[in-house]
Amino acid sequence: MKLPRKRTTTIILAAVGLLLCSLASLAMLLVGADRQDQRYAPLLTAAAAAPIDAATEARIRGFCGDCHAVPRPASFHRDMWHNEVEKGYQHYARSGRTDLDPPPMGLTVAYFRSLAPEHLTYPEPAVAATEFRVSFRTEPLQYEDTVRTPPAIAGLCWARLRADDSPVLLASDMRSGHVISLDLREPRRSARRLAQLSNPCHIEPCDLDGDGTIDLLVADLGSFKAVDHSRGRVVWLRHEAPTGEFKEVVLASGLGRVADARPIDMDSRGRLDVIVAEFGWHRTGRILMLRNTAGPGQQPRFEPEELDPRTGTVHVPVYDLDSDGRPDFLALVSNEHECVEAFLNQGHGRFHRQTLWRAPDLTFGSNGIQLVDLNGDGKIDILYTNGDAFDNDYLSPWHGIQWLENLGSLHFEYHRLTDMPGACVALAGDFDGDGDLDIVAVSFLPRGLKPETVDVKSLPSIVLLEQVARGQFVRHTLERGFPCHAALVVGDFDHDGNLDFAIGNNTMGAEAQALGQTWAAVWWNRGRTSRP
């Protein structure tokens, strides 16, 4: 890109100033990374004052787009780019790589600042012309332990604990460490503590030992805050049939932050293995297979095997994607990768990795997927949210909900469904009983949200997308001002034929203090109104 002379001069002056401001901190970082190595010296020179010509721009884009998509300048307002570029250079310094040609940091900052807007603008999605034909009644839920410890619900699940009993609401509280169940048929709504873990996240019901009772597979983060450590675990809550109690059995420990764990009979032996999304943070994280090595009639015994070394995997749902009779799994990988990938089971313990879709920007904020046939064509699609703002507390204009439509032969077509700041979980269900799937979604944003000009109380926190024709949706906003819902589950909780949903509250979220000790709320579907 050829720049006019006046603009080039402006960029040169900005680059020099920004570089001088960052020399000290960056020098300490780079010297700490390798005190004896001078290969980073060009980053610390005044060469940043060179004009940004086409060759320099190519150098910047080559460096900033080597392991992920080149960041979009419009992802942040102008004054944010110094911090964002510095983080990228820090990441490169820590990586130990020497194969790239990093431009002087001040020049890179100046390049992105020159293209970034002074202030961000946020989209205003169109809403439905008429109200949703279904009304809801909300019921806040409280749990006695939240009086002492504010709730931080990370996962909700609607499942049976006994094959011959009705489903119950299961929840994981990543602050208190509790895994709890709540029978919504009980008038008192008293919760039962099933286990005390460290920082539980995803809960997956399964019969891991094949004894006919329903166990719980739990991903335990190992910390409340996002840091690198080795305290993450995969925990099997083994259901003791005679007593109804759950015994904690650790399947894997010494891991980074574990976000998800799913059972998979990888080679159709009749014994369940486990796929693990070890999200980690910056230096920890990967995708693991816990291979069940137990013999017939023995209790499960697992050996870990790394399938992918990247950090940032959020979800690993299991599905036979290529219809060959062998279970595959999908992985939503965030951090700088921002992609959905299929791990196709080749048999004999081998998987072939294939990218199904990749976001155009490393700040996309991927945070959840659901596998569901959204348009009713018989093929499993991917419902996908991107609204993670907890890495920098910054509200992105790109947050929202999308649908990756399965066209067959492992080809998926991208459809943007709606914009939604902090979109965290989206689940499909037929809420209006018309035979097709609608979508309910919740948002989760941090306290101290930036930029400060954002009016948090005006932001949508629960949205419903009504499917009005195959693959076509209109938007209804059910709630505003409480973007602290980190969990969501859908089910017919009262067995009246109408689909309800429940939300989980996390006090890390914005405006959570206004909800007090309410750890969850049920939105009871009261059925269709008279509108045709």
Feature locations, PLM:
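N-terminal Sec-pathway targeting helices
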Residues: K2-L20
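Alpha-helical transmembrane segments
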Residues: C21-S25, H337
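Juxtamembrane cytosolic interface motif at the C-terminal end of transmembrane helices
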Residues: S25-G32
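Accessible peptide chain termini
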Residues: M1-K2, S530
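Beta-propeller-forming repeat regions
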Residues: A33, D37, P42-P532
